């Protein structure tokens, strides 16, 4: 599914901008990711090299929910679909697992988990995507739009 979510920030709208933003966040996220975020490590589909990307990662039990906001255009999603074994560093620790697309029957549970958690970092993130004052309801609506318009994944942790 191709994502339709647009932002007032042209930096976020470009593929290069997203990579640059992730690269800027990476050193901080490697030290201690904010609640609800993490560093996803994949294997490059063409090069076989290790690739790391900062992502919103919601851990619930032995599952972690992620969304490729830009849908199938997202490079890390293409890497995951080609080689589903991933490593994920979240606040609780570093885990390995197998990533797959969210199935229709588990979508309501995944949507609730993805949209439920709010941290301070979400308020900053909201200001990059939307104009206006960030409120919990507006942040959840933004996350729901990402989930509905993007490509949701679940990582089954080992």
Task: Describe the predicted segments one by one.
Residues 1-31:
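Extreme N-terminal tail/first-helix region
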Residues 2-11, 93-158:
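Charged, gly/pro-rich active-site loop segments
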Residues 26-33, 74-81, 143:
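Short linear motifs in intrinsically disordered
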Residues 35-69:
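Short beta-strand segments
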Residues 58-89:
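A short mixed-secondary-structure module that forms the rim of ligand-binding clefts
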């Amino acid at each position: 599914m191709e994502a339709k979510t647009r932002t007032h920030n042209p930096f976020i709208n470009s593929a290069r901008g997203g990579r640059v933003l992730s690269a800027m966040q990476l050193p901080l996220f490697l030290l201690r990711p904010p609640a609800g975020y993490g560093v996803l490590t994949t294997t490059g589909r063409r090069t076989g090299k290790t690739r790391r990307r900062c992502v919103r990662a919601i851990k619930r039990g032995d599952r972690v929910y992620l969304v490729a906001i830009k849908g199938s255009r997202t490079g890390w999603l293409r890497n995951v679909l080609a080689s589903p074994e991933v490593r994920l560093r979240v606040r609780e620790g570093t885990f390995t697992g197998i990533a797959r697309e969210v199935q229709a029957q588990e979508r309501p549970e995944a949507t609730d988990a993805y949209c439920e958690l709010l941290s301070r970092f979400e308020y900053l993130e909201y200001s990059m995507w939307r104009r206006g004052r960030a409120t919990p309801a507006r942040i959840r609506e933004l996350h729901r739009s990402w989930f509905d318009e993007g490509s949701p994944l679940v990582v089954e942790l080992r």
